[in-house]
């Protein structure tokens, strides 16, 4: 990380193993990204206050969207604390249980501002993807690129790794066709090195 040009790259290192016991590891990653990004940008004299405020607003919005998406998924599948549904995928049994008892209370309180607006899961996913697309464009317009290193995955349980990687794909897949022909210049790129 130290060899990358600090004027061009914003590097974040997420220790997955440290947060593995969290009820929702992808949520920890998302919150980590926005907290660290905000802290690094606040130290950067080349980024205007307007851009810093915009990124902070995007961060808050994306974290709230993720909370609401998880709550919606829990309600839609009617998963109750303590249940242990098993999913079979390509002959491999995966324990897909989720004890959301602690997390649901937190999510309900955090999403009260959105009570009057009931959005579909599809719209929330698109909105979350748009937050990251807007972040990518904002950083690119200011000559910055975001690199997130996820360390210690090999020390995590297999189902937590799969859950985290699937969520990363969701966070950063931009979906749809971009009208801009120079799409590849600003596009978020995901590279998995295991």
From Swiss-Prot:
InterPro entries: KAP_P-loop. It holds the Pfam family KAP_NTPase. It comes from the Archaea. This is Uncharacterized protein MJ0182. It comes from Methanocaldococcus jannaschii (strain ATCC 43067 / DSM 2661 / JAL-1 / JCM 10045 / NBRC 100440) (Methanococcus jannaschii). The lineage of its organism: Archaea, Methanobacteriati, Methanobacteriota, Methanomada group, Methanococci.
């Amino acid at each position: 990380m130290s060899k990358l040009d600090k004027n061009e790259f914003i590097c974040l290192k997420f220790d997955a193993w440290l947060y593995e016991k969290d009820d929702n590891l992808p949520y920890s990653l998302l919150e980590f990204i926005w907290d660290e990004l905000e802290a690094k940008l606040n130290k950067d004299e080349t980024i205007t206050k307007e851009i810093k405020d915009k990124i902070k607003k995007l961060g808050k919005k994306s974290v709230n969207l993720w909370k609401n998406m998880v709550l919606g998924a829990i309600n839609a599948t009617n998963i109750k604390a303590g249940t242990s549904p098993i999913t079979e995928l390509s002959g491999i049994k995966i324990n897909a249980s989720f004890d959301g008892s602690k997390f649901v209370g937190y999510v309900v309180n955090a999403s009260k501002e959105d009570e009057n607006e009931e959005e579909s899961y599809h719209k929330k996913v698109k909105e979350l993807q748009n937050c990251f697309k807007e972040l990518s464009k904002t950083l690119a317009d200011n000559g910055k690129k975001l690199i997130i290193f996820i360390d210690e995955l090999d020390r995590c349980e297999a189902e937590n790794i799969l859950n985290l990687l699937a969520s990363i794909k969701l966070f950063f897949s931009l979906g749809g066709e971009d009208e801009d022909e120079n799409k590849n210049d600003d596009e978020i790129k995901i590279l998995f090195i295991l």
